[in-house]
Amino acid sequence: MGNNVVVLGTQWGDEGKGKIVDLLTERAKYVVRYQGGHNAGHTLVINGEKTVLHLIPSGILRENVTSIIGNGVVLSPAALMKEMKGLEDRGIPVRERLLLSEACPLILDYHVALDNAREKARGAKAIGTTGRGIGPAYEDKVARRGLRVGDLFDKATFAVKLKEVMEYHNFQLVNFYKVEAVDYQKVLDDVMAIADILTSMVVDVSDLLDQARKRGDFVMFEGAQGTLLDIDHGTYPYVTSSNTTAGGVATGSGLGPRYVDYVLGIIKAYSTRVGAGPFPTELFDDTGEFLCKQGNEYGATTGRRRRTGWLDSVAVRRAVQINSLSGFCLTKLDVLDGLEEVKICVAYRMPDGREVTTTPLAADDWEGIEPIYETMPGWSESTFGVKDRSGLPQAALNYIKRIEELTGVPIDIISTGPDRTETMILRDPFDA
């Protein structure tokens, strides 16, 4: 039996993690976010009602679940308050269900200003960030000048630290990027107005998780973005600024690494990517447009149209290696309904003619890669909302089996629609 279950994306994000976390938290006591920030966009559909979460864990809608934001998350006070208000307006008692690590770095206005100034300065070489200050906040953390939630307990000292760090960043904004400085007093006033709310939710997350482990409580760790956007293992530099992989669970929450019992990789039945960066199987034809429209592939956070393409088993195998995946959850299978044929990338042809079955590590090495496809028959029958494996067309079952063969990982859950009920659980991670 697995008490500590990790749910993470195996591609470039947007795989459908939020729905699966929400579904599996029916048995969980805690749900923990351990990396990223409000650049995530987790969409939940429950009884036809849609909820989009960016910062708060997807367990927040469950009455008996405590949601935790761990130290690996960069926290925007403004974004958190906005999200809390939206949920509280719907009658969800967020403050009774949400806890924070005091070690969470804060995202403040100057981080957002830096993020946008840098993207503008890069011009055609822009990374395609969400412009929400995620990267600059992580930079401050690593440089040991960042302000954290715990600093809000001493407001006078916080004000001094804030002034020092803002002088540093405003110098860059004005003299290098040639944009306006961020107003110190406004930033201070905005944070002080909600400081007591934030500190009232602080808890020692590592100790809480250790006590939960000793009691045998079920804990779900919710990843954001996807493996191929990991700062170390992704398509660098077109990556996010955190460790999106299973290794980030221990460092981003304080759970001992030996205590992760099961890692569930969410894999979309095709591939998508937002923003710039390598994408070998990207489609620019009618099929790519079909996938975009059928899958409603527009970012929950930015609203940007996602790039679409065939499933890339080479890239997914890298995710299998890095995360030591226990099983897959296959999502958006229904989006492929109606296609005469479906393709899976099984290898890459390099510019020098070599065929390889592993992904390059450097972004420049992705240049000129051609995907080598295996083509399979599609299916005309609808898989939307199917809740039993026996109700799937044979061609869809063959597609599922081939994914398992190419990756060496079993598909334990199949999602056939956005609602939490439109799911087949073949093996429950908490029982694995």
Swiss-Prot record:
It comes from Citrobacter koseri (strain ATCC BAA-895 / CDC 4225-83 / SGSC4696). This is Adenylosuccinate synthetase. GO terms for cellular component: cytoplasm. Homodimer. Substrate binds at residues 300-306. SUPFAM superfamilies: P-loop containing nucleoside triphosphate hydrolases. InterPro entries: Adenylosuccin_syn_GTP-bd, Adenylosuccin_syn_Lys_AS, Adenylosuccinate_synth_dom1, Adenylosuccinate_synth_dom2, Adenylosuccinate_synth_dom3, Adenylosuccinate_synthetase, P-loop_NTPase. The lineage of its organism: Bacteria, Pseudomonadati, Pseudomonadota, Gammaproteobacteria, Enterobacterales. Mg(2+) binds at residues 14, 41.
